[in-house]
Amino acid sequence: MTRIKICGLKRPEDVEYVNQYLPDYVGFVFAESKRKVTDAQAEELSGKLDKKIISVGVFVNEPAEHVIKLVKKGIIRMVQLHGDEDAEYILKLRENLEETAKIIKAVRVQCREQILEAEKLPCDYLLLDTWQKGAY
């Protein structure tokens, strides 16, 4: 089944658009980016989201405590990791979050072996991404 995620919401009008079209997921970027949001911005925007839409926090090497706080406050309902987060980091999230908070791990791959290794991670979904030196 195809699922749709629109990422990088930052403005109130972005929420108006997604509420009209109802994608499955929307992403709030907490990593360094021109689309980065603060906790307060994400809280305000997620509060206006249609409840059918699952909010996803996108992170790169973020302290686990910050991710956990955002989920527990209900600002995000799903976690997408794009950095160097390993199995230990993911397990720490799992220990502190409800089962309903799914975890996506993005893995930058260059070869088949990296995909096979990534399959061992304790995440709910793998997102295979293009490998580019120094980029997440």
What are the language-model segments listed below?
Residues 1-136:
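Conserved N-terminal beta1-alpha1 strand-loop-helix module at the mouth
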